[in-house]
Amino acid sequence: RHGIDLSKACVRRIMIDAGFWVPRKQRPPKVHQPRNRRACLGELVQIDGSDHAWFEDRAPACTLLVYVDDATGRLMQLLFVPTESTQAYFTATRAYVERHGKPQAFYSDKAGVFRINARENAEGRGYTQFGRALFELNIDSLCANTSQAKGRVERMNGVLQDRLVKELRLRGISSMAAANAYALTFMADFNARFAKVPRSDFDAHRP
């Protein structure tokens, strides 16, 4: 319009010199305020899959599906599977519901198991297979925009990659089947030591 032809790099440099642009490396890190815990057990359950060398060099790496109650930090469900998949979450969620009942909501990332892409949404397919199953069970499915938003399960993954790996080593456990058999014992001990008391004693799980 004004007959000025400048490269992007030149415009960026002018903006930096004028104080209108801050290079990414010089920007202060974003501070993510921790979200308050929910009040009741079963009100919100964070779920995630953690791909890791759970058996160290004794067996191939696999994925651990982790279900953490938001109000208490309790481990509610652990399942070792070959990889994160819809079928794996079906299996883990069925076991969860059979043991605890139906939570009010699951909180996950935006992986394809939980959230359809824009094209599928435009075609009118509003749910993934897993999302449809949760809808039929009357369980809300919430997706986090960032990994920090589901920080409790992310931090739990880190704890498990240290503590659970050591326990598996001590017990000579080197297979998913054996690890899944041990998971209930591990969860009971972990929760007895580290779970927090919720603000409300109401259990929000439903039959």
Segments from the language model and where they lie:
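Active-site-proximal acidic segments at structured loop/helix or strand boundaries
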Residues: Q161-P207
